[in-house]
């Protein structure tokens, strides 16, 4: 990664500088007992540092959603899969929400993918879709959001930040379950 290539948008001279800064910013927010959902491209720049990066992060519970640069982690027999609590292409989770900051309690569903989708499972039930890949160039629609680090000054998002964004966003019924929609 250099100033000469297309991915110099993050203003680092080397991939090493970039990765060191990401690790520093993640560790400043994500604590040992937190749960981190990483939405892909863990091994951008090559597979040589997969284990090294994982060891430098304080968080013990990291779930990886495969991105287009994670081909060294994808194979079922990859030794790198052991670095993560789980690895998959998409993940749907229901999280217990008990947040004084957001004023919400109960459960909230999330559809996690490296790629942004127009529709996703249970969107008509209020499930929030979180994605990366597009480096902030693909605006969310309805209850979807690009949570890639490019959209948050190279920091991960807290759950409360995401919930706050969708506090007043109505549930989207535009899919095959609503026959009255054009």
Predicted regions and their residues:
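Acidic, histidine-bearing metal-coordination/catalytic regions of metal-dependent phosphoesterases
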Residues: 1-17, 32, 154-182
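Conserved beta-sheet core of the metallophosphoesterase superfamily
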Residues: 63, 79-178
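Core catalytic region of metal-dependent phosphoesterases/phosphodiesterases
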Residues: 1-97
